[in-house]
Amino acid sequence: MTAPAQVPDSDEGFIRFEGIHKSFGPKVVFDDLNLSIRKGETLTVIGGSGAGKSVLLKCLIGLMDPDRGRIFFDGQETTGFDEKQFLPVRRRVAMVFQGSALFDSLSVGENIQYPLREQEPDMSEEERAKKVARVLSLVNLPGIEGMRPSDLSGGMRRRVGLARAIASDPEVILWDEPTTGLDPISTRIIDELIRSMRAKLHVTSIVVTHDMQSAFTVSDRIAMLANKHIVQVGTVAEMRASPLKEVRAFLDARKGEARVE
């Protein structure tokens, strides 16, 4: 059966992927992938396991290179940048990892300060402490600077990971499966935080998730990755009403995954 045509996305976005091809040996992950992300929006990328959602994030920040195609960040092409050239881009981007990626040997406060010491070496200890307190308040975890990650629940660890990410004042936040493995209450808290980051900090967010309830809650637009490219980009209402078989099959398969609270 013929695959649906690649979705054109000519909108001059803040972040753009144009004609991206990526393979790992014989496995083709992207074949002429195009996607545009608008400044200040929350765009969620959905798709089956192994579709390449996380690979897309890694290509954006230079952890992987596309085989062909072009990537633009705020009007500047970053394709082919070396590590030194990517540094200014990475300082504008923060990633919230599925596993939080906290150092168990450090306190919560020390974990949040860790990237600040490298990125802002001239910042005083008092300024760092104030920033840590501010970002912990933003994720509704005030006063836990002295706790260890091992003392925290999974949801709290995820929120500390977010606090560390926003401590560097990013313009873009990348969320890699932010609700995976969390209980329904923690999931709802993370969803609310994703929404509040846009409202309070005016960041651009790219969310990778299998959790369609979360995607419907947090997204301005949703992009469906299937058949090695983006088959549809649309609002929540447009995706719910999509006639495309790839989108319908993906959504129908997840109808039974409703959260129990």
Regions found by a protein language model. Name each.
Residues R148-L152, M156:
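Conserved ABC ATPase signature
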Residues A167-E171:
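A short, proline-enriched helix->beta-strand linker immediately N-terminal to the Walker B motif
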Residues I61:
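Helix-to-loop junction immediately C-terminal to a conserved catalytic motif
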